[in-house]
């Protein structure tokens, strides 16, 4: 969240709805309503939230819902598949998400490369995650740089989420 915004505070705290309802394994916490999640965030004193799987996907509906609980959208997770899919399609998906984030006044997108990821499969061992070749790394890095350019064009910051069970998890 912008340090020049309300109260001119340089640090503002938000929380992720995954602490109530898991995005990777949605049955974990599925009984929580979005209203309960946002109400409890507000009661705990948080000012923002990450986008979760129970949130409306229409910008005006999302803004209205967040305003009801005096919260702002701080960021959104976005899975990319640059190594597995056509770069052009993946970049189009990034731009669509970034455009949505701009519309709801969010400032950050959290990108994770999920090609071949095992993090959402409870039956897979983390050791079975994909290992990238040198050319895969070059493709991924180049694609992330292009995604960063898209984000910059919209005034959105790109943060990379190095999730366990994804191809970027290495011993190095």
Predicted regions and their residues:
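Hydrophobic faces of well-ordered beta-strands that scaffold small-molecule active sites
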Residues: 11-17, 49-51, 73-78, 107-111, ...
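Active-site mouth loops of central-metabolism enzymes
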Residues: 19-33, 52, 80-91, 129-137
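Short, glycine/charged-enriched secondary-structure capping and boundary segments
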Residues: 28-30, 63-66, 123-126, 172
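Acidic-and-aromatic substrate-binding clefts and catalytic sites of carbohydrate-active enzymes
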Residues: 48-61, 80-92, 164-170
């Amino acid at each position: 969240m912008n340090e020049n915004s309300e109260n001119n505070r340089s640090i503002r705290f938000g929380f992720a709805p995954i602490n109530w309802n898991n995005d990777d394994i949605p049955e974990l916490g599925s009984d929580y309503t979005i209203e309960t999640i946002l109400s409890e965030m507000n009661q705990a004193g948080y000012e923002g939230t990450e986008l979760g799987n129970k949130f409306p996907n229409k910008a005006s509906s999302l803004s209205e819902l967040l305003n009801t609980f005096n919260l702002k959208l701080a960021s959104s997770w976005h899975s990319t598949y640059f190594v597995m899919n056509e770069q052009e399609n993946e970049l189009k998906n990034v731009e669509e998400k970034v455009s949505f984030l701009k519309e709801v006044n969010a400032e950050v997108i959290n990108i994770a490369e999920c090609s071949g990821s095992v993090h959402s499969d409870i039956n897979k061992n983390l050791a079975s995650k994909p290992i990238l070749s040198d050319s895969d790394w070059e493709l991924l890095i180049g694609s992330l740089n292009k995604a960063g350019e898209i984000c910059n064009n919209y005034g959105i910051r790109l943060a990379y989420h190095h999730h366990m069970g994804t191809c970027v998890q290495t011993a190095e």
